[in-house]
Design a protein with these regions (language model features):
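Short Lys/Arg-rich basic patches
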Residues: 2-6
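Short, contiguous alpha-helical
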Residues: 7-11, 15-18, 28-85, 128-177
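A short secondary-structure junction motif
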Residues: 24, 116, 120-123, 159, ...
């Protein structure tokens, strides 16, 4: 039941995310209100990388999809980078990634997450996957993923609104059902 709730929650977030990134331009992906503000393209990449790291590496002790499917080579980016600790200069100099390819990577990550959730037994949510991090259970990881996904999706929608003002979303926009 908990796995179903988490699945529904992240699927709903995905709907919000797809609405927020609909019709973005390359310029929109790179736009920064100030040099210290993360642009939409960087936020998207970071979201997908963090989910990949948490589920594949931290919980399951697998190679990340980023490495297994050689997405780091597709984007010509470092193997172990996920954005944590980036300086404003690194964020400003981050390359503009092809949105379609980035979304393809994100879809692979989400599929991996959902596949793992479908196999997860309720009691496994209390498992501590890493001895060196004894205070983090599988449930804690999913709480973090859900929180980060919604937070970053909100940031993306807000930035899009800053760029486009009243035209950020169509006049017939409604929240996903």
């Amino acid at each position: 039941m908990l796995a179903r709730f988490i699945t529904d929650t992240i699927n709903k977030e995905q709907e919000f995310l797809m609405q927020a990134i609909d019709d973005l331009t390359v310029s929109d992906l790179r736009w920064q209100a100030t040099p210290e503000v993360n642009p939409i393209g960087w936020i998207l990449w970071h979201m997908f990388r963090v989910e990949d790291t948490w589920v594949q590496f931290f919980i399951q002790n697998n190679l990340e999809i980023w490495e297994r499917q050689k997405w780091n080579e597709v984007f010509d980016l470092p193997l172990r980078d996920n954005g944590f600790g980036h300086t404003p200069e690194q964020v400003s100099n981050f390359p503009t990634l092809d949105l379609a390819k980035l979304l393809e990577y994100g879809a692979e990550v989400r599929t991996g997450t959902l596949d793992y959730l479908t196999e997860l037994d309720f009691n496994e949510f209390t498992v501590i996957p890493r001895e060196r991090r004894p205070n983090i259970t599988v449930a804690d990881v999913f709480r973090q993923i859900v929180g980060e996904c919604y937070q970053h999706t909100g940031q993306i929608a807000y930035i899009k609104g800053m760029i486009r003002g009243a035209n950020a979303f169509p006049s017939d926009y409604t929240a996903p059902n």
